[in-house]
Every structure is written in structure tokens, then in C-alpha cells.
């Protein structure tokens, strides 16, 4: 497993789409652990409000299995219960995954992440420095914006009315206009 990297805008691996979509809200640095080459792949962002109907949950798990079997690179915070289960589904395959925590990079790597990191199919990417240890609503909003800006496609499994996810979906639709 590699050591964490700090990526600056001058780095050739820097995703230039960030500045196009986020403008002044672009993080000045990105911190990464894992295979940075995953940033160059076509990516689908996964978002799901914390509470959603059962039918949506099952359909989203089926979609995650489809992405896994198709080898699609999925990027997400994997924070909501549905997103967490999708991560478990994705990690059971060989497809690439980018996890973006709403805080600094983790100090300890979860056991289920070690093998995907070692084989180069996992990237843990954060827009937050070491001073941001705890997830907050504000950090989650900024993280979700980062995830959306990095993605080529966006999959909103469920958007609760009035939620932060709804506001993000509206922002993303403005990028595609």
C-alpha cells in the first residue's frame, strides 16, 4: 500500500474539470491514497439520501451489482446506509472504486479496503487536510460537490424533498445545461 499523496493543480494528474465546475470553490489541494490513475477513468457518482423507500434500495443494490459486473468506476462518499451497502457490493468484484470521505484521509485503513488498495482498484480521495477529523454537514456538502464535479455521470438513487441531495442535484443539472 502506498503512502498518501498531495495533489496540486499544477500536477498533471489534477482533474481540471474541478475548476470548470466548482470555480472558486475548488479545493486548493487533494489528498489521495491509492491508485491516482483511477481519476482518468470515466466515473459515475452515486448519491442517495439517508432515508429512502424499500423499492429504491433494492433497485440501487441491483444497479451497484450491474456496475460491478460491467467494471464501471464508481465515485461516492459512501456515507448513507444505501451507499455503504453499494460499496460492499462493489468491493466484492473487480471494478474500480473512488471513496471520498467528508473529512481528511483515514489514519487506519479498513480491512475490506486493503486488498482493493493493494491491487490498484481503490482510491481514497479527500479535499480536506489533516485538521478535518470529524464529518460535519458542511464538510459532507463540500465533499458531495467534489464527487459530483469529478464524475462524468451522476446517479441519484433517491432525492428526499428539501434535502442537501436535492440542492446538489439542482446544482449538477446547471453544469449540464
Ranges and model annotations:
Residues 1-57:
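Short, positively charged patches
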Residues 4, 70-74:
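Short active-site oxyanion
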Residues 10, 33, 48-51, 79, ...:
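Structural motif
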Residues 45, 75, 96-100:
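A structural signal for isolated positions on well-ordered beta-strands in alpha/beta enzyme cores
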Residues 49-56, 73-81:
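Short, glycine-rich nucleotide/cofactor-binding loops
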Residues 61-69, 81-176:
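Acidic/glycine-enriched connector segments
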